[in-house]
Amino acid sequence: MKNSFRFSFTVITTFIICVLVSGAMVNGQCSFPQPVGPNGKCVPKDCKSLCHKKYKGGSICTTGKPNICMCLVCRRRSPEV
């Protein structure tokens, strides 16, 4: 009886860990920083072009220091109508 409980507990724990890890892998990293121009400023037009060329995704220029071009590559679910 004690061994069957231990086995069941081990199987359930392993299953839960596998589900959590696979969920993290599916989501993955959604944004990738890209270098900005030599003046250190992110130009939205250049950022958009670079991100579309490299990742086929969207882009955003962050404000503040450092000024970074972020490429957004996660697929978003479309709202259900």
Curated annotation (Swiss-Prot):
Organism domain of life: Eukaryota
Signal peptide: 1-24
GO CC annotation, single: extracellular region
Biological processes, Gene Ontology terms: defense response to fungus; killing of cells of another organism
Disulfide bridge map: C30-C74, C42-C61, C47-C69, C51-C71
Record's keyword terms, sorted: Antimicrobial, Disulfide bond, Fungicide, Plant defense, Secreted, Signal
Family affiliation: Belongs to the DEFL family.
Name used for this protein in its record: Defensin-like protein 144
